[in-house]
Amino acid sequence: MCDEYLNLPIEITRTIGEIPFTEKIKEVYSKMKKKISYVYLIILFLFLIFYIGIFLAPYLYDKNRFLSLLIYGIYSQICHQMPERSYYIFNHKMGVCARCFGIYTGVLLGMLIYPFIRRLDNFKTPNKWYLILALTPMGIDGTTQLLGLRESFNELRFITGFIAGFVALFYILPVFLGVINKEKVFIEMKHTSHQKSK
C-alpha cells in the first residue's frame, strides 16, 4: 500500500473523511522527508564517531593506555586485529585490520556522497549484480588467503574492502531508511483515517 501511494503522481481524487487524499499524501510525505534527513544525519554522526575510534585507539595508546585498550577491545568484537594485517599510525596498529578499515572507509565515503547522487526518500536498491560484483574481489582475496593458496597484502585488502563497503552502502542505507519511514506512513494514514471516520 505504501509503495503504491508514494510512487503515484499526486493526482488521486479519493478522500479520507473530509480531507482530499492527495493533501494527506503530501502532508505525510513532507513529514517523512524531514524524518529521513534527520535519521540520515544521526546515522552519519554515529558512524563518524565509530570511524574516528579506529584512529583514537592507537593515538591514545601512549597517552591513556586504559582508554586505548578499551577502544581496542570494542573493535576486537568485529575484527581480528592481526598486527601483520593492519595499518600502523602513531606507531601503533589501527583499531581494525586493513580490510575492515577499507570497508568502513568505503561506507563513510558512500554515506557522504549518497545525498548528492540519490534522493534519501528513494528506497529502491540498485541491481543485485552490482553488489555481487563488488563483493567478489574481496571474497576471492579473502578465500584464497584463508585456504593458503596465496598471501594477500594490506593495500589489496584495503582496496577490495573499500569497494565492498562503498557499494554495499547503497543497498543497506535505502533499505534501512525505507523500513523506518514506511512504518511511519502506515501509522499516519491509519490514524488520520480513524480520526476522520468518527
Mark where each language-model region is.
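Extracytosolic (periplasmic/ER-lumenal) interhelical loops and adjacent juxtamembrane/interface segments
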Residues: 62-96
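Hydrophobic alpha-helical transmembrane segments
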Residues: 44, 96-115
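Small-polar-interrupted transmembrane alpha-helices in polytopic inner-membrane proteins
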Residues: 46-54, 125-147
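Interfacial helix-loop-helix junctions of multi-pass membrane proteins
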Residues: 82-98, 139-164
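N-terminal signal-anchor transmembrane alpha helix
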Residues: 38-65
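Short, highly charged, low-complexity non-transmembrane loops/tails of multi-pass membrane proteins
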Residues: 181-198
